[in-house]
Structure formats: structure tokens, C-alpha cells
Amino acid sequence: MAILNNESGEYAVNIVQDALGAPVMDADFKKIYDKFSHRICWIDGQVVPGSFQMNTAWYDAVPERDPIFMEHTHDDADELIGFIGSDPSNPYDLGGEIEFTTGGEAHLLTKSSIIFAPAGLAHNPMRILRVDRPIFHFSVITKTMYDGEATYR
């Protein structure tokens, strides 16, 4: 089997290495977001037909306004939300503190965590309280498009 570069081959279209398909943020929110977060990759059914939606980002600072992500639900899809520490010697240490609310319960995350939000469960607000080193964030929704209302303020 030959090893191909990511621009050639029948299935190269399935390899996403940027966030070009991410929804456009309004200008005011983008200014705030870019100061604490760096989106890495975004995939959904528009970027790769048939794919479900996934977002990845690094959080490396506390937002100037918190909470920035507000409570919402996804009535027709489950979601996974992850926060992973970046210390390879201690991967369970989050390297910061995130307050994440699910079902009306606020939880303080200090360890690498994945949260399951089944369809219909209210989740967020989310507050980034402390960042000692970058925190890897991802979210996965089990449908082709993230079509909910804006979850930020």
C-alpha cells in the first residue's frame, strides 16, 4: 500500500486539517473568542458529506467575559463535550478549572473530562475559571450539522 499525501487519493476529501467549515462568528464574539481560544479543526456534513459534526480547539486563557457559552439543548442529537489536559506526564490533570453545568448542576472540572449530554438535556453555561497550560477542547454532535441557536453571548 502506498502512503499518499493528504491532497491526493480517492478518500483525501475525508481528511480535514483546518476549521474552514466552522460557522462564521459575529465580529464582537470573534474578538473575545480569539483571545482565549484557537479553533483547530471543524467537520460537519457540509465539509464532508455524511459526516457528523465535531469541533476542536485549544483554550489557553480565561475569557474576558464569563460565562461565554450559555445554556442550550439539542432536542434531536446527543453531544459529547471534552476537556483534556496537555501535560503528557500527568494527562489526567486538566491544567486549569472549568465550571460546566449540565441538567442544572454546576460541576467543577479539574481533571481531563468527557461529558455526555443526551438529546434534550440542558447543558452550559460553561465558565473557564483558570488556565495554567493549554486545555484541549472538543465537541461532537451526532448529526450532520450544528444548527442550534448561537450558544455564546
Predicted regions and their residues:
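A short, N-terminal "cap"/entry segment at the start of jelly-roll beta-barrel domains
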Residues: M1-D66
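Double-stranded beta-helix
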Residues: M1-I15, I128-R153
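Conserved short histidine dyad/triad with adjacent acidic residue
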Residues: Q53-S86
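Extracellular structured ligand-interaction cores
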Residues: A77-I81, G95-E97, I135-H137
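A short beta-strand-loop-beta hairpin characteristic of the jelly-roll/cupin
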Residues: F83-T110, G148-T151
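Short Gly/Pro-enriched loop/turn and capping motifs at secondary-structure junctions
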Residues: D87-S89, A122-N124, K143-Y146
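Conserved metal-binding segment of the jelly-roll/cupin
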Residues: T102-I128
